[in-house]
Curated annotation (Swiss-Prot):
Plays an important role in the de novo pathway of purine nucleotide biosynthesis. Catalyzes the first committed step in the biosynthesis of AMP from IMP. This is Adenylosuccinate synthetase. Mg(2+) binds at D13, G40. Binds 1 Mg(2+) ion per subunit. Keywords: Cytoplasm, GTP-binding, Ligase, Magnesium, Metal-binding, Nucleotide-binding, Purine biosynthesis. One of its GO terms (molecular function) is adenylosuccinate synthase activity. SUPFAM superfamilies: P-loop containing nucleoside triphosphate hydrolases. GO terms for biological process: 'de novo' AMP biosynthetic process; IMP metabolic process.
Amino acid sequence: MANVVVIGAQWGDEGKGKITDLLSKSADVVVRSQGGVNAGHTVVVQGQTFKLHLIPSGILYPDTECIIGSGTVIDPKVLLEEIDQLHRLNVSTENLFISQTAHVTMPYHRLIDGASEEMRGDRKIGTTGRGIGPTYADKSERTGVRVLDLMDLDNSQDKFVWAIKYKNVILEKLYDLPPLDPQEVIEEYRAYADALRPHVVDSSLKVFEGVNAKKNILFEGAQGTLLDIDHGTYPYVTSSNPIAGGACVGAGIGPTIIDRVIGVAKAYTTRVGEGPFPTELDDEIGELLGHVGAEFGTTTGRRRRCGWFDAVIGRYAARINGLDCLAITKLDVLDSLDEIKVCVAYEIDGEACEHFPSNANLFARCQPIYKTMPGWKQPTSDCRSLDELPKEALAYLKFLAELMDVPIAIVSLGAGREQTIIVEDPIHGPKRALLDRNGEPIG
């Protein structure tokens, strides 16, 4: 039995959805612990593409319980659209459960999110405009609406009316936007409540019952380490904690429950929105990575910025999360390159630096120090074992493992489930990896 956390080791979009989908086959329960519809993950099964935002990837396995935890923020309209999409694809949501204490995104959250981002001008942080930040802000301000309020609208209607009137003042006076009609909003959300009611539970208790029953539990992270509100590239971050520690808080369990942490990283680096990005490529190679890697956001459709693998932020993610092993994704995107660069350190104002600087202004001045490696110039998407990989690709993986001091357990070579090299099931198998801590193949 093992309880496993899957987190993003970069700026999100690392391929966590595919890795979680692979591991969900061996999991009894999959828990989404933070974030909202600002996150997006794509899973491809037998040529069919599933794009999910709030619902855990484990929903594609009919016997797997999927829990949306209390650390998330829920837009009921989008969630119901997602449920409807799954039903049209003949996927059951009978095993989907929603935390009664998760906070609810309201129409005014989306309006304020968009208006405040516009007001920032050239100081934009790259929000998705989905109302996530304002929802978390109300949670911290203790004026938020929770799912349990939504389920008890007859008794909590005064709370809804007060919140809408309060936000109307902000919409009108600060952003010059028309006010919302409280009764219209309440009736809209009453319909959402009726549709979601069968799924609402005490999520912390449900997870705890799974732990006591010795079930395999998979905690699915959203976004990535460098987007963490406390440990990321602030202020260009999300409003929650996508790191491994955040899984405990968002799921309502203690840290001793967690057995291992898997970090997911692309074989290169991407970032969406604003903020410093030392290895960003504005040339034809950056364009190639974006084109071959189909680097467009699942949630926003925005083009992702692309660059070389950054081992400095990789080491930082390993430290912050206590990574046990890595899943490296999209190795196949590098197949056509003559040479591949890896950022091994930074230069800041003429001084070498091997550690991630928390100061955003300092980080913006970082110049990458690269190690150049030969490319392999042959396709890898059909490889199913380490022995089938070109020696240059294996050397590249070995180098990444050495730089991060974390073994590589999974190598993904495409979007499909079958396009994966894996030796041991990270949930049921022993704590070993495809590459050991010295980067040597296990065989």
